[in-house]
Regions:
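Active-site-proximal beta-alpha core segment in soluble small-molecule metabolic enzymes
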Residues: 1-20, 31, 39, 52-55, ...
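Short acidic, glycine/serine/threonine-rich loops at helix termini
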Residues: 5-6, 67-70, 113-117, 152-157, ...
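Polybasic, low-complexity intrinsically disordered segments
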Residues: 25-27, 32-56, 60
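Short beta-strand segments
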Residues: 104-106, 143-145, 232-234, 298
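Flexible glycine/acidic-rich beta-alpha junction loops that bind and position SAM and/or redox cofactors
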Residues: 108, 140-156, 187-198
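Short glycine/threonine-rich loop-to-helix capping motif typified by GTGT followed
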Residues: 112-119, 151-164, 195-207, 280-285
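Glycine-rich and small/hydrophobic secondary-structure elements
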Residues: 159-176
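Charged (often Lys/Glu-rich) extended helix/loop segments that serve as interaction or gating elements
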Residues: 173, 177, 181-346
Length: 346
């Protein structure tokens, strides 16, 4: 449904005169006359711009963050009698209240295979051509979405946006020339790529506990290990659910002092008393790490605080902005009073 956070998003967007991105077939039905989005736009007596979101069958990101379920996407193939084209036609017929300005594609999250974006873009151009051939209308805009990868650990690479977006633009131009179509206005959404590296989460170390491992234990590089040090911190899955939910990996650094040159294999764990409450699965930290130290976990600017919760009644930490002019609190730390303010006593 179109209810989120207690707000009916479709009429709210129409009231604000915003460009709408339609990503749910229930918002506009192929039947046409009862299209809910059209009804909302009619209520405010104004024409609203709309993009239609297309899903693709790419298994490139974690299954829980993929935007394109393979079976669903195959059912929405870009052919003349496909549901995607049918919905576009239905929206186009409602030009009195809905101005169809383009299509939107989003194939997943943190994708390292740059060629997948090119394949999705080519399909979008073919859909655009098919729509033009049947309705003589050139969709002027195509949003090719986001999902560009960033490096979370030392062994990963961030996608080179300058290079890959250049390749993507060239591919779009080439396909449109071959199709005899004018190039659309192209937009991209490098949200994670932009925001993730700007965030660092600071944790205070609690218990530090070495645990002997079996003779067959190995680290992620395949080297035999006999001991792992469990480093507990004052946070965890309440402030960063991604490791527990997606198996996401991070790294960590000792932030408050220079530690010993000797390191030990460590696993940084949260405070929620669950085996899945892992902050960093494997990292080498100074051997003298101790209670009270501060650990910095980088690349938490995206999908960190925005996915934070009060799980186990944990309080959501503050956000501090740091720049050349100094540091200032951007979002204050949550308090017990904040948490209890939701309770209703009668």
């Amino acid at each position: 449904e179109d209810q989120k956070f207690g707000v009916s998003l479709l009429p709210a967007g129409a009231d604000a005169g915003k460009l709408g991105v339609l990503d749910d077939l229930t918002d506009v039905t192929p039947a046409g006359s009862n299209a809910r989005l059209g009804e909302h736009a009619s209520e405010v007596h104004a024409q609203r711009e709309l993009q239609y979101d297309i899903k693709y069958p790419y298994d490139l990101s974690h299954e829980k963050v993929s935007e394109g379920d393979r079976k669903l996407a195959e059912a929405m193939t870009m052919v003349a009698d496909g549901p995607a084209l049918a919905v576009l036609k239905d929206i186009y017929r409602r030009q009195d209240v809905l101005e169809l300005v383009g299509v939107h594609s989003h194939i997943g999250s943190n994708i390292h295979d740059a060629d997948a974006f090119i394949q999705a873009a080519k399909r979008m151009m073919l859909l655009r051509k098919t729509f033009y051939a049947t309705d003589a209308y050139t969709l002027p805009e195509v949003d090719l979405g986001g999902g560009y990868s960033v490096a979370y650990t030392d062994g990963e690479d961030s996608m080179d946006i300058d290079v890959e977006l250049g390749r993507l633009a060239d591919a779009v131009s080439t396909v449109n020339r071959a199709l005899g179509m004018p190039a659309p206005v192209i937009s991209f959404e490098p949200g994670r790529w932009t925001v993730a590296p700007t965030g660092v989460t600071l944790y205070r170390v609690g218990t530090v506990k070495p645990v002997e491992l079996s003779g067959e234990a190995k680290d992620k590089s395949g080297n035999p290990v006999t001991e792992r040090v469990y480093v507990s911190v004052d946070g965890g899955m309440s402030d960063n659910i991604r490791p527990a939910l997606y198996g996401s990996d991070y790294t960590a650094r000792l932030a408050n002092r220079k530690g010993s040159e000797q390191t030990k294999l460590c696993r940084v764990v949260g405070m929620h008393c669950e085996s899945g409450d892992i902050v960093v699965n494997e990292v080498r930290l100074p051997a003298d790490i101790k209670r009270g130290d501060i650990l910095a976990v980088p690349v938490t600017g995206a999908y960190g605080r925005t996915m934070a919760s009060n799980y186990n009644q944990a309080l959501i930490p503050a956000v501090v902005g740091v720049g050349e002019a100094g540091a200032h609190v951007m979002i204050r730390r949550q308090t017990i009073d904040d948490l209890l303010s939701w309770d209703v006593s009668e």
